[in-house]
């Protein structure tokens, strides 16, 4: 049984993925009291798995370069970049959406003024406005993008919306939904050949859980 390395996004998706792994009998005992550890042995009679926790944007890199065979990461991260791997499963967890949001006075029509859009996801925002035939100025922000329209930095924002509470608390409204997103499983292309049996087993078992 070949060793399979899984890169898992820290935080919210981590907890949901571990629940799925438990259901298919992957050994997650070391993850219950992980402290500062980053690598975990999840081996048992059914699986030979090594799991490590990384930031969302790094999951793709680990998988693309073969340091991880499998990755669990949000679709938002995948949409923003263009890296080489297989996207094999929608895990149906971590559901939220991309949306255009602004102060209630904002009008989406182009008008004469070029709109300024604040976002952590410039590639996704660029593609969204390209499809609308709109020329906008994108302002990349790493922190709380909701602040952009409030202080006059931007006319609107493109961001992830889960409950909408943060928008409401800051006086913003959703102007338009862009797309639904959720957690995905990705696989290194070479690993799919060299560790095919082990990886297919994990994919099939996780698929069965998702369908239930």
UniProtKB/Swiss-Prot annotation:
Known function: Catalyzes the condensation of ATP and 5-phosphoribose 1-diphosphate to form N'-(5'-phosphoribosyl)-ATP (PR-ATP). Has a crucial role in the pathway because the rate of histidine biosynthesis seems to be controlled primarily by regulation of HisG enzymatic activity.
Cellular localisation: Cytoplasm
Region forming the signal peptide: none
Enzyme class: transferase
Record has Signal as a keyword: no
Gene name per UniProt: hisG
Designated name of the protein: ATP phosphoribosyltransferase
Tree of life domain: Bacteria
